[in-house]
A protein has these predicted regions:
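Conserved glycine(s) in the ABC-transporter nucleotide-binding domain "signature"
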Residues: 1-144
Length: 144
């Protein structure tokens, strides 16, 4: 568990570090998806894509070959993913599993950093609100 850095300057510094780490992780996600697409010829039963979702979270996910513009995703650990894997030849299955593990690692790394980044930003915002009350109380005297 990460402790809150002492001092708001250190919190801001940690936020900047987290931002840089998140950018690096997203680059690694994009490289992983590109490597897969360069290593395998179409059509793929599924391929990794980087997806940005609300709230700033970014994931690399398996996109199934869609029809009519639909973009369905699959998790290799769920039932549909297991069916997909079981239909692949063993060497290809092993490659999909290897990519899947790398994707899981990148996704959890990004999610943990994004969660910490979000909480630290909220911490600074909450401190600013409380500072406003502290300064208002000091300038108006103690009315309590």
């Amino acid at each position: 568990m990460t402790d809150i850095p002492h001092g708001r300057g250190k919190v801001r510094q940690r936020i900047r570090e987290l931002e840089a780490e998140k950018v690096e992780l997203i680059k690694r996600m994009e490289v992983l998806a590109q490597e897969f697409q360069q290593a395998f010829r179409r059509p793929w039963p599924a391929h990794p894509v980087v997806q940005r979702v609300a709230g700033g979270y970014v994931y690399v996910r398996w996109r199934l070959q869609g029809r009519n513009g639909k973009q369905n995703y699959v998790d290799l650990a769920c039932e549909a993913g297991q069916v997909l894997l079981s239909n692949l030849e063993l060497p290809v299955r092993n490659i999909y599993v290897r990519y899947g593990q790398q994707m899981l690692n990148l996704n959890v790394s990004h999610a943990v950093r994004h969660g910490e980044w979000t909480r630290l930003r909220q911490y600074l915002a909450d401190c600013a609100v409380l500072d406003g009350y502290a300064h208002a109380g000091a300038s108006h005297g103690n009315d309590a």
